[in-house]
């Protein structure tokens, strides 16, 4: 049972952040002539939208797996060309080329019991936070929403109700196991006609420019290798005036909460071992939270990607935070 929380007990006031601008060159995607067979599902996007290239559309209940001319790195495609180029995988420093594969292994391992562990680790509060994040999009009937790192579909369930029959939610995740869990969950709830599933790299998005009214990413950004690149990709595919909403673990705003939270999170790997039989994956998740940028740093990154009106809302005294940014509307020419 989910504990009851009022908005006031979870969040603090919005904090204004000075905007900084910045854009990147778009990474062009070309669908392969003979893509791998779709592993999972796409709903009836072929009748509802033109965001996915026709050559990549599949039948009802299949996931679109979209690749680019520079293939997504996986644990089958590791490159060690630049051993000096490293990034963090939890506390470990690993070659950049290895991180995507390591993260993939984590989520393949935990996918089946991911939702159960979310409830255990957050004491159910993740559901309240996701509802708040979905509300922050201001999504309405007819909107097209991209849910990045959408995994097991919690955000899609909420957003699909907001956009209605004339809108569409695109659940995009690089991990097929997580998408499979999300597909099954939504099917069990009878959500079929306005959700599409795309297996693709969030750092190289396969959608046309200015496709979406809003983009969400809930508890997924910290797993990206190049967060700045991912944010620039989001800027590229969101419409002018569109909202970016990021829900992520963050830095508690007082020492007492920080120490209590660290103590609680230390037992997550042990709980993970009991519930899923996998301790190491949850050790990574704990470490990835500690290595994630704090509220101000992430706000600056969002601004540097080009978003304006950047702000964040602390939840549970900063244990998590919702960041928002808006893509500026084009100024009318004289």
What are these regions (language model features)?
Residues 113-116, 122-144, 158:
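Conserved alpha-helix/loop element of class I SAM-dependent methyltransferases that forms part
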